[in-house]
């Protein structure tokens, strides 16, 4: 079993590394083709879309992941299918409402909040993708829970940016609006492929009695707040920086942020492979198995992350100059963000551990404290020091959140994720 999980982790890492490379290349293409201002407008619109989609999913991500993981581990495919159908129906209405509100008030948001009137049409096009992105995310999470790791990563992290990157290279795209139209098409197309892929790949099984919406919401609402506050560390920083400084600074921050995320793609890859197993082990009351898996995963992540961290930290100017000569000036931002991502990896899969072991209330409370602290710090330091302040604040917030969660995991599960060498 452990050998199988290691194999899945290696496959996940390779695929996530591929998706990181694609994201890096697409970011290079976007910044070079659109320029700093237009790419900044695109990144602001994208950030608002991601946080809107997060809200629309009602915190169902980890609920779906955990329950599908348990169902698939016991070969109860009818229950897994029934659960996916229920959760997808639940997100249709809120995602359409959120998308509709952004479309309706796109000019007011662009002109009055961000002081970027040209952002209006970009937001309008982004709003069309929100319902499809919400449904696509749930499908990819269901694939992950069913141990179809390859499909989950391909459909969530490789196909959409891949389509966008090819279109940017082939088509005469010069504006954020045109880029957004292609992005929305890539999401809709990938959703259709994902839905058909789920039907083909997953056995039908006997449909089990549907879990009530009330039960799912009681479990998911604490995780909704966790998801929103977690996004506040990354997406929230982009939005706040956009309001205070404008599109040019956003473009530099997002570029550095996306590069630094290459370090923690190992964490994402391991979580994709291990999360369903954590849920199954907890359902069997096997805490020693969870501890062993947690320690081995942290060692694996560090082994792969440290070389990436060293390259990005030693050669930041060279890495950032690839996006354009004007981006080399923000190389210090990349270094700051890289240290935060290294802390993220060193503390292990603390959030996933709590979410997969029915500690979502504790997770919500912990993330609320650190999330509010982080957002306040981002506002203060962004206003005082601009781009550099935003990078410092978001990095301190991410490090504080992960170290706090280490304490929470130790208290509730008896596992100290940073003593993995023992």
For the regions a language model picked out, list residue spans one by one:
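Interfacial/gating helices of multi-pass transporter permease domains
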Residues: 30-51, 120-121, 215-219, 223, ...
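Signature of the first transmembrane helix
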Residues: 4-62, 99-103, 221-247, 379, ...
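Membrane-interface junctions at transmembrane-helix termini in multi-pass inner-membrane proteins
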Residues: 132-155, 338-369, 409
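Interfacial segments at transmembrane-helix termini and the short loops linking adjacent helices
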Residues: 106-126, 247, 295, 314-342
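Interhelical loop/hinge segments that connect adjacent transmembrane helices in multipass membrane
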Residues: 1-5, 176-182, 192-234, 277, ...
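Hydrophobic alpha-helical transmembrane segments
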Residues: 124, 153-201, 369-373, 387-411
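Helix-loop junctions and terminal segments of transmembrane helices
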Residues: 58-74, 145, 260-285, 291, ...
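Helix-terminus/linker motif at the lipid-water interface of multi-pass membrane proteins
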Residues: 24-39, 110-113, 231-262, 281, ...
């Amino acid at each position: 079993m452990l050998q199988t999980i290691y194999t899945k982790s290696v496959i996940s890492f390779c695929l996530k590394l591929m998706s990181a490379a694609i994201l890096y290349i697409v970011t290079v293409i976007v910044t070079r083709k659109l320029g700093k201002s237009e790419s900044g407008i695109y990144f602001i619109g994208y950030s608002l879309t991601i946080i809107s989609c997060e809200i629309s999913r009602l915190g169902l991500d980890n609920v779906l992941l955990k329950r599908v993981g348990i169902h698939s581990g016991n070969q109860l495919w009818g229950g897994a299918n029934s659960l996916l159908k229920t959760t997808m129906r639940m997100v249709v209405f809120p995602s359409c409402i959120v998308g509709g509100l952004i479309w309706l008030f796109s000019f007011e948001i662009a002109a009055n909040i961000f002081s970027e009137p040209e952002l209006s049409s970009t937001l309008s096009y982004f709003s069309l993708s929100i319902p499809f992105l919400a449904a696509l995310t749930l499908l990819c999470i269901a694939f992950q829970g069913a141990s179809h790791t390859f499909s989950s990563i391909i459909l969530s992290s490789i196909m959409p940016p891949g389509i966008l990157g090819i279109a940017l290279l082939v088509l005469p795209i010069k504006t954020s609006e045109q880029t957004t139209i292609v992005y929305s098409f890539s999401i809709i197309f990938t959703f259709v492929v994902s839905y058909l892929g789920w039907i083909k790949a997953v056995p039908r099984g006997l449909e089990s009695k549907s879990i009530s919406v009330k039960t799912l919401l009681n479990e998911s609402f604490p995780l909704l707040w966790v998801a929103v506050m977690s996004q506040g560390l990354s997406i929230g920083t982009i939005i706040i920086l956009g309001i205070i400084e404008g599109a040019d600074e956003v473009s530099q921050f997002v570029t550095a942020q996306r590069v630094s995320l290459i370090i923690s793609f190992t964490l994402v890859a391991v979580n994709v492979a291990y999360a369903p197993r954590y849920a199954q082990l907890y359902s069997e009351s096997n805490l020693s198995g969870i501890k062993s898996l947690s320690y081995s995963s942290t060692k694996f992540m560090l082994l792969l992350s440290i070389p990436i961290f060293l390259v990005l930290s030693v050669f930041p100017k060279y890495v950032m100059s690839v996006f354009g000569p004007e981006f080399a000036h923000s190389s210090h931002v990349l270094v700051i963000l890289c240290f935060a991502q290294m802390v993220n990896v060193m503390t292990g899969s603390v959030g996933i551990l709590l979410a997969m072991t029915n500690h979502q209330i504790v997770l919500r409370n912990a993330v609320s404290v650190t999330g509010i602290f982080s957002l306040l710090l981002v506002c203060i330091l962004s206003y005082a020091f601009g781009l550099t302040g935003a990078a410092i604040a978001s990095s301190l917030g991410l490090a504080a959140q992960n170290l706090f969660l280490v304490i929470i995991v130790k208290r509730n599960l008896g596992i100290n994720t940073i003593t993995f060498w023992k």
